[in-house]
Amino acid sequence: RETPTPYPYGFGVDENNPPQPNMSEPIKLVGLMKESGVKLVNASMGSPYYNPHIGRPFERPPIDGYETPEHPLVGVDRHFRLTADIQQAHPDLPIVGTGYSWLQNYVVNAGEANVQDGKVRFVAVGRGSMAYPDYVKDTMESGQMAKNKSCVAISYCTALMRAKDNPLHQFPSGCVPRDRFYAQIYKDAEKTLTQQ
C-alpha cells in the first residue's frame, strides 16, 4: 500500500513510500558503528508502540493494539531479508537476527538455515524464550523444539509489558498461555488495559 505523504525523517524507509524499506542508511550506519569499534549489531525494525507488526509479527494483537495489516510471515520474511542485507554488506561483523518467535517450534530450523546461508551470524529469540526458556536444551537433546512449549504469538506478554498501572510501574512479563504464574497477573493487568 502506498503512503501519499512524503516521510523525509524516516530511517531505513523510502521517504516517498514509508512502508517500503531503503537499507542504504542502516547499512551505512552499521559501517560507521563498525569503524567506531562496535563488534556486534542486533538488527531490529519498526517501533513496538507505533507499528509492532513490523518488529514482532503476531498472531493476535495485544488488548490495546490493532489487527496486523499483513500475514505474520510477511513480517518474518522482512526481518530475514533486511537482516541479510546488513549481514551481506558487512560479512566481517556478526549481525544478530530477530523476528523469529512467530515461527513457534520452527525457530531453530529457520535460524540454522539463515546462519548456514550467511544471512545472519546469530539468532535472538525474545518472546519465544519467555514461553520456552529451555528451547536450546530441548533442541540439543532431541533435535527439535516442542510445539506445546513454543510461543504462540498472541501478545499477552506484550500487554503485560504495556500495562503500567501497578506499584512497580510495569507488570512482570511472561508467557500467560505457557506459564500459569502469569495468568493471574494478566487478569490484573487486563483491568488496567481496558481502562486506558
Where are these regions (language model features)?
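Flavin-dependent oxidoreductase catalytic cores
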Residues: R1-Q196
